[in-house]
Regions:
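Intrinsically disordered, low-complexity segments enriched in polar/charged small residues
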Residues: 72, 92, 343-345
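Short, glycine/alanine-rich hydrophobic alpha-helices that insert into or span membranes
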Residues: 100-102
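Structured, non-membrane catalytic/scaffold regions adjacent to prosthetic-group chemistry
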Residues: 1-16, 25-49, 53-64, 106-422
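N-terminal secretory signal peptides and thylakoid transit peptides that target proteins
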Residues: 77-98
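Membrane-interface capping segments at transmembrane-helix boundaries
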Residues: 64-73
Length: 422
């Protein structure tokens, strides 16, 4: 034992304690991440324990493997056949096959769970409906693998500058008075003609209900949201107290899909999608602002949605024939103004010299997009540039907002070029 003790101290120090401490230090901001939905503190402990077991297994495997390869089984005489090498090669080969098979199975499972198949899903084109089906709702995630939360483990905490700390399990949370509300969400990175925008009917508990039960203290000015994937974001307490700001648990009459935040996500009308956090686990009242995940990457600082509109039909560089469309060429699209509603949509086919009012086929509410259409009769064959603009509920016409900067949501007018033949 005395001879082995120095070796044990060296191997455990180099291959166990040192990498464990370095990993905890480097990964500390991420250790509260929980794939199954543990609250942040238990998740941090479980992750640290998992790292310790992993590094201990690694250290023991290295030490015992080295000892197995270097220690002779016995000392044969010159005439005796020694099968040690053959046995060891057989054992190592078998272990290698097991490791390879296990690794391949793990990779297959990870590929099945990965978000690659749906991250960046867009919703646009000829099939756009007033209410977006759940499986076609736009989706953006920071995770390679999104959480799959066990509802029995999930808790929602209300902490910070409050009088009464609150903790809800899923049953208690869903027993609170709930409302249903149609709201459109849009990603801050959505281009003028892109489809990172969708509309759904949400059901959930007003965030104000949870905050009033906790009793905000003087000095509380911001609400910081914490999610099980370690995502955080912040918005003003005044917006959190708005009756339209929800903690939603249903989407279009169904439980929230995993990719959209099951069991609870926040819906904040008028703010870009990054503020509508998914997999919510803690609501913290603070006195100061704190940068969220995407804000740290440079997005912002303005997160309120500007007035936007889009042409879905016809497509860019579409070729059409006047002879085949005697009743005119149909134009269709959407208009959206955050939480201000859309009162009017107009189109131009002459570079903005004249604007014609489109028909609003689906008016929605002040929290949703509108669907519009217009029958266009080109005066002659040729190339045309079509564009659209919307007017919000306060009468403010869509415009280029240079002061917003490139990372606070692009502004301007969506334009498509089409060619009309005789």
């Amino acid at each position: 034992w005395r001879r082995e003790k120095p070796k044990l101290l060296i191997s455990s120090g180099v291959f166990f304690f040192l990498p464990l401490l370095v990993s905890i230090a480097v990964l500390w901001p991420e250790l509260g991440t929980s794939y199954q939905g543990w609250p942040i503190r238990p998740a941090t402990f479980i992750t640290c324990l998992g790292l310790a077991v992993s590094f201990l297994t690694f250290e023991r495997t290295l030490v015992l493997g080295f000892r197995f390869l270097t220690t002779p089984l016995h000392q044969p005489d010159e005439l005796e056949y020694s099968p040690q090498i053959g046995r060891r090669a057989f054992v190592l080969g078998g272990l290698g096959l097991i490791a390879a098979g296990s690794g391949a199975a793990i990779v297959r499972r990870l590929c099945q769970l990965a978000s690659f198949s749906y991250d960046g899903t867009q919703y646009k084109g000829t099939e756009v409906q007033a209410i977006t089906p759940n499986d076609k709702f736009y989706c953006v995630t920071k995770n390679v693998i999104d959480p799959r939360i066990d509802p029995s483990l999930w808790r929602l905490e209300v902490t910070g500058r409050i009088r009464h700390r609150q903790t809800y399990n899923l049953h208690r949370f869903k027993s609170l008075p709930a409302v249903s509300q149609e709201t459109t969400l849009m990603c801050i990175s959505n281009g003028l003609g892109a489809g990172l925008m969708s509309n759904a009917l949400w059901r959930g508990v007003p965030l104000s209900t949870l905050l009033r039960a906790a009793g905000p203290l003087p000095g509380a000015a911001k609400v910081r949201l914490h999610c099980v994937d370690n995502y955080t974001d912040t918005f003003p307490l005044s917006k959190a107290m708005d009756p339209s700001t929800l903690v939603a648990y249903e989407m279009n009459g169904e439980r929230l899909p995993d990719r959209h935040g099951f069991p609870a996500r926040v819906v904040v009308p008028g703010y870009f999608g990054e503020k509508n956090v998914k997999w919510l686990t803690r609501i913290e009242l603070t006195g100061a602002d704190a940068e969220g995940f995407y804000e740290k990457q440079g997005w912002g600082p303005d997160f309120k949605i500007p007035t936007r509109s889009r042409i879905d039909v016809p497509d860019e560089w579409a070729w059409m024939s006047l002879a085949q469309m005697p009743n005119g060429i149909p134009m269709k699209g959407v208009g959206f103004a955050g939480d201000r509603g859309v009162s009017k949509v107009e189109v131009t086919v002459d570079g903005g010299k004249t604007w014609e009012q489109a028909t609003i086929d689906y008016p929605g509410t002040k929290l949703t997009w509108v669907l519009w259409s217009y029958d266009w009769n080109p005066p002659r064959p040729g190339e045309y540039k079509l564009s659209v603009r919307a007017t919000d509920g306060a009468g403010v016409v869509q415009r280029v907002e240079k002061a917003r900067g490139p990372f606070s949501g692009v502004t301007g007018f969506h334009q498509v070029t089409v060619y009309v033949a005789a």
